[in-house]
Amino acid sequence: NGSFGETIDTIYTAHNKSASFPRISPDNQYLLFTESDYATFPIWHKEADLKMISLQGSAPVDTDILNSTDVESYHSWSSNGRWIIFSSRRLDGLYTRFFIAHLNKNGKFSKPFLLPQKDPDENNLRMKSFNIPELSRIKSQSPDLSWIIP
């Protein structure tokens, strides 16, 4: 009959908006995603915010502390599920910078902080827009060896 199943399970309804970049926490407790008015590239949508639901019943989790009046978009979980890194244009509305926030055992986020740089002026001088942060447990270094992350 051309159908895949008899029921459709919906864990979140975006209410005439778009939900993009869904990522489940490593402990399978939460689903974090970006919600915007439309489309699938929310880094260009000022209204884009991070949203999260509990996967133990689909209840929304308060993410207000993560969001600003500008764009919050792509995000990544730490391997232990207690930290996230995400892209935001909250500082100037023009350039994307990475922010980090902690998620406690009760599902409450801490206030996000700007990803530290070896030279703090780098956050003001950088003219490129980085959109897709990923947390990794693998050692990284730049091709010219100007930075190394152990």
What are these regions (language model features)?
Residues 1-150:
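Sequence signature of WD/YWTD-type beta-propeller architectures
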